[in-house]
């Protein structure tokens, strides 16, 4: 950059560039995603370094056919960086927020038990779980990542407290990485029961 001669005048000498991306981690992530649309990101929250940022479907920049397919719509979403631009249901990561809200709400939270029978019915809707965990405490349910336990706990905690803890955790906000804003997260439980 040269203010006198022009904004983007080419200089005779180059500059060094160091990336924090780990090619092995990115390759493993890409292989793990296979043909599924999705993203894998590994971000060091202490330093701001991005270790892995993989988004699929992807394309080969050196293959003109791939680029043409993308223009024709056959490759829907290949130019979307899903790590920065897409939003996803938080899934099991939201159990941390539910647990924190439960700890804040109930003095007996560590003794409080719920039953998992491969899931649980909440307001006429079946919430399935990957296991049949039986009666368990918060600690056991967290270790099992039990959907049934955390669904029942969320109902008992209530909409207002869950919303409060989701806001504290950064939901409904965006963040920037090196000046690039990520998609704003979205959390709305206004249609749920109290």
Language-model regions: role of each:
Residues 2-39, 46:
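Conserved, well-ordered alpha-helix/loop/beta-strand core segments that scaffold catalytic motifs
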